[in-house]
Amino acid sequence: MPGLRVLLASSEVAGFAKTGGLADVAAALPRALSRLGNQVAIAMPLYAAIRRSNIPIERTNVVLPVPMGPRVLACRLYRSQLANSEVPVYLIEHEPYYDRDNPREGRGLYQQQSGGNRTDYADNAERFVFFSRAVMELVPHLGFTPDVIH
Protein backbone atom coordinates (compact mmCIF):
# COMPACT_ATOMS: atom_id res chain seq x y z
CA MET A 1 0.00 0.00 0.00
CA PRO A 2 1.45 3.39 -0.94
CA GLY A 3 2.14 5.87 1.81
CA LEU A 4 0.30 9.06 2.54
CA ARG A 5 1.02 12.35 0.83
CA VAL A 6 1.52 14.96 3.56
CA LEU A 7 2.03 18.72 3.47
CA LEU A 8 3.21 20.10 6.79
CA ALA A 9 2.76 23.87 7.21
CA SER A 10 4.66 25.49 10.05
CA SER A 11 5.69 29.00 11.02
CA GLU A 12 9.12 27.64 11.98
CA VAL A 13 11.26 24.59 11.18
CA ALA A 14 14.54 23.67 12.91
CA GLY A 15 17.46 24.27 10.59
CA PHE A 16 15.63 27.22 9.00
CA ALA A 17 14.03 29.34 11.75
CA LYS A 18 13.43 28.44 15.39
CA THR A 19 12.06 30.07 18.51
CA GLY A 20 10.98 26.97 20.41
CA GLY A 21 9.88 23.35 20.36
CA LEU A 22 7.50 23.75 17.41
CA ALA A 23 10.50 24.07 15.09
CA ASP A 24 11.98 20.82 16.40
CA VAL A 25 8.75 18.90 15.80
CA ALA A 26 8.24 20.54 12.39
CA ALA A 27 11.63 19.14 11.30
CA ALA A 28 11.54 15.74 13.04
CA LEU A 29 8.01 14.71 12.04
CA PRO A 30 8.49 15.13 8.27
CA ARG A 31 11.80 13.22 8.42
CA ALA A 32 10.14 10.35 10.29
CA LEU A 33 7.11 10.29 7.97
CA SER A 34 9.38 10.27 4.92
CA ARG A 35 11.48 7.39 6.31
CA LEU A 36 8.24 5.42 6.73
CA GLY A 37 7.55 5.73 3.00
CA ASN A 38 5.24 8.73 2.94
CA GLN A 39 5.61 11.58 0.45
CA VAL A 40 6.15 14.71 2.54
CA ALA A 41 6.72 18.41 1.89
CA ILE A 42 6.99 21.38 4.25
CA ALA A 43 5.76 24.96 3.76
CA MET A 44 7.00 27.86 5.86
CA PRO A 45 7.55 31.62 5.58
CA LEU A 46 10.81 32.90 4.11
CA TYR A 47 12.18 34.97 7.00
CA ALA A 48 15.09 37.41 6.79
CA ALA A 49 17.14 35.06 9.00
CA ILE A 50 16.91 32.36 6.33
CA ARG A 51 18.13 34.80 3.69
CA ARG A 52 21.07 35.78 5.92
CA SER A 53 22.00 32.15 6.59
CA ASN A 54 24.03 29.72 4.50
CA ILE A 55 20.97 27.57 3.86
CA PRO A 56 20.76 26.89 0.12
CA ILE A 57 17.47 28.19 -1.24
CA GLU A 58 16.35 28.26 -4.85
CA ARG A 59 14.06 30.93 -6.24
CA THR A 60 11.31 29.43 -8.39
CA ASN A 61 9.34 31.11 -11.15
CA VAL A 62 6.12 30.62 -9.20
CA VAL A 63 4.32 33.72 -7.96
CA LEU A 64 1.13 32.87 -6.09
CA PRO A 65 -1.89 35.17 -5.85
CA VAL A 66 -3.14 35.16 -2.27
CA PRO A 67 -6.69 36.47 -1.69
CA MET A 68 -6.93 38.47 1.53
CA GLY A 69 -10.46 39.80 1.84
CA PRO A 70 -11.01 42.35 -0.93
CA ARG A 71 -7.26 42.44 -1.76
CA VAL A 72 -5.14 39.97 -3.66
CA LEU A 73 -1.53 39.94 -2.48
CA ALA A 74 1.30 38.03 -4.10
CA CYS A 75 4.04 35.81 -2.79
CA ARG A 76 7.02 34.24 -4.49
CA LEU A 77 7.87 30.63 -3.89
CA TYR A 78 11.38 29.45 -3.00
CA ARG A 79 12.50 25.89 -2.49
CA SER A 80 15.04 24.18 -0.27
CA GLN A 81 15.46 20.79 1.35
CA LEU A 82 15.26 19.63 4.94
CA ALA A 83 18.75 18.55 6.04
CA ASN A 84 19.41 14.81 6.18
CA SER A 85 16.24 13.99 4.26
CA GLU A 86 14.55 13.98 0.88
CA VAL A 87 11.86 16.37 2.16
CA PRO A 88 11.40 19.54 0.09
CA VAL A 89 10.80 22.81 1.95
CA TYR A 90 8.72 25.45 0.19
CA LEU A 91 9.45 28.95 1.44
CA ILE A 92 6.76 31.59 1.04
CA GLU A 93 8.17 35.05 0.42
CA HIS A 94 6.17 38.17 1.19
CA GLU A 95 8.64 40.73 2.48
CA PRO A 96 6.18 43.07 4.24
CA TYR A 97 5.20 40.18 6.54
CA TYR A 98 8.31 38.02 6.87
CA ASP A 99 11.40 40.12 6.17
CA ARG A 100 11.52 41.94 9.51
CA ASP A 101 13.37 39.65 11.94
CA ASN A 102 16.77 40.97 13.01
CA PRO A 103 18.06 39.99 16.48
CA ARG A 104 20.60 42.84 16.52
CA GLU A 105 17.72 45.28 16.29
CA GLY A 106 15.55 43.41 18.81
CA ARG A 107 13.17 41.97 16.22
CA GLY A 108 12.30 38.28 16.18
CA LEU A 109 9.94 36.13 14.14
CA TYR A 110 6.86 37.11 16.15
CA GLN A 111 7.92 39.92 18.51
CA GLN A 112 9.98 43.08 18.77
CA GLN A 113 11.79 44.79 21.58
CA SER A 114 9.92 47.91 22.65
CA GLY A 115 11.53 49.81 25.48
CA GLY A 116 12.35 47.10 27.99
CA ASN A 117 9.51 44.81 26.86
CA ARG A 118 8.95 42.34 24.08
CA THR A 119 5.69 42.93 22.24
CA ASP A 120 3.99 40.91 19.53
CA TYR A 121 3.87 42.43 16.08
CA ALA A 122 0.47 44.09 15.77
CA ASP A 123 -0.21 42.30 12.48
CA ASN A 124 0.69 38.74 13.57
CA ALA A 125 -2.85 37.48 12.95
CA GLU A 126 -2.86 38.93 9.44
CA ARG A 127 0.65 37.59 8.73
CA PHE A 128 -0.34 34.04 9.54
CA VAL A 129 -3.77 34.19 7.89
CA PHE A 130 -1.79 35.17 4.78
CA PHE A 131 0.60 32.24 5.33
CA SER A 132 -2.30 29.78 5.76
CA ARG A 133 -3.98 31.02 2.60
CA ALA A 134 -0.67 30.97 0.68
CA VAL A 135 -0.23 27.31 1.68
CA MET A 136 -3.58 26.53 0.05
CA GLU A 137 -2.48 28.36 -3.11
CA LEU A 138 0.79 26.37 -3.05
CA VAL A 139 -0.92 22.95 -3.26
CA PRO A 140 -1.29 22.85 -7.09
CA HIS A 141 2.48 23.46 -7.41
CA LEU A 142 3.61 20.58 -5.19
CA GLY A 143 3.58 17.85 -7.82
CA PHE A 144 1.23 15.81 -5.62
CA THR A 145 -2.17 16.25 -4.01
CA PRO A 146 -1.83 15.96 -0.23
CA ASP A 147 -3.94 13.43 1.64
CA VAL A 148 -3.17 15.41 4.79
CA ILE A 149 -2.35 19.08 5.33
CA HIS A 150 -1.09 19.57 8.87
Model-inferred region functions:
Residues N38-V40, V89, P146-D147:
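Hydrophobic anchor at the start of a short beta-strand
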Residues M1-T19, M44-L46:
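Nucleotide-activated donor-dependent transferases that construct or modify glycoconjugates
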Residues L22-A32:
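Short amphipathic alpha-helix
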Residues G15-A23, D120-N124:
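Alpha-helix N-cap/helix-initiation motif
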